[in-house]
């Protein structure tokens, strides 16, 4: 461990400071496709009984009308966060009739792209903007890739913890600047070490053969309808996913918040010729994309982790970051575990907390030389062949065996897990470390290996396996309904969201959509750091 990490742990471990670690916030967003009992994409509209996707803060849609997104509140205890996620699932199942929630990250067999419905958010200007943005995503990347689902894990330290750490360190800026500086340092370490999460929690080693739409690939045939890689952990996070020439040169610098926001601001304001050639409207005058820039909006940039700040109404993410600094990080590289009803377990959450906290507290030099490309290469190697015996990664420009480096990282994370246990009066973080060490020692214990083992044991391809797991989870949720009070609470939220959308559409100022989009685009150009 570095001297800095030791000093920070000692400070946080003092009796008067330990309670700060109980105030970390945890939020989870889980995406999942709605499918028919025959494992086909459900092309029905977003169920009105779930509320309005535009205004319901717990149940919305992601890219497609068929792609649900469940969002928990940010809570101090991950037990409560996961309980909230479980209840949202149970509410959803009470309104889905015979449809199922698809259990893995990689999608079910998909129809032709023209039959994949884009999420619809009503007739308000902001609703139409969200719809046109998704039309642009389809134009730029295709609809198929947008149907991949994942888990996003939001984590923050309390501001008082950052203020405490700042007191003992030589930092020239104010408390807000130090907090942003520290979150960006966290992200640099996450870039260095996130390959470990893919080994431990990657759960997408196989996919439906039709997903590739005839594109060339290096996958192997598992059966007539399934492609896979024998040692893969997460094909979802491999180069089968986002492949964008426009974004190829967009590598936001994580040296500081200013350079990060500047790079994204440039991307949302810089035309990209292939998009310029397409234009923003089709021959019928219909919008096809919000603009012809490298990115339509900043969220189009695909990354494994994002610095975030809760936005005010009408505020863009970059505006919030520039105005008030980084508030939390959003971990975006987690696969859905198809063996778990909600896709994530408490044991996994405990480890992620310790891992992210390690990234926050450990020394984090700026990414220099080949370190940035090595981080990307390590990540790609692990998602495609992380379980390959003897796999080497690059650490400090020298080869190191994955198992050795992973074990070394767990040893460094252990004191943080111990401190979290001490703060919360539990031993679950240390137990989670032991579970992960067992996966490092025995690759068959990883979710990716277990997916392939289950497929082989049942003589199933990807779709049959996924449908079976989806049915198992549906049975669990349908036989564990919410209490009457809980059900009424969710129904009230859904009803309120429908009323809010209707009010928005009825009372919105008379601004035509073209003007609204122009103002939205101009808002990014007026920001100054």
From Swiss-Prot:
One example GO MF annotation: metal ion binding
A Pfam family found in this protein is: Glu_cys_ligase
- Lineage, top ranks: Bacteria, Pseudomonadati, Pseudomonadota, Gammaproteobacteria, Pseudomonadales
This protein's pathway: Sulfur metabolism; glutathione biosynthesis; glutathione from L-cysteine and L-glutamate: step 1/2
Source organism of this protein record:
Pseudomonas syringae pv. tomato (strain ATCC BAA-871 / DC3000)
Protein family according to the UniProt entry: Belongs to the glutamate--cysteine ligase type 1 family. Type 1 subfamily.
- Give the top-level enzyme category: ligase
EC number(s) recorded for this UniProt protein: 6.3.2.2
Tell me the GO BP annotations in alphabetical order. Answer: glutathione biosynthetic process
Keywords from the UniProt entry: ATP-binding, Glutathione biosynthesis, Ligase, Nucleotide-binding
Record field: catalytic activity: L-cysteine + L-glutamate + ATP = gamma-L-glutamyl-L-cysteine + ADP + phosphate + H(+)
GO cellular component terms, A-Z: cytosol
The protein depicted here goes by the name Glutamate--cysteine ligase
Q: Which SUPFAM superfamilies match?
A: Glutamine synthetase/guanido kinase (SSF55931)
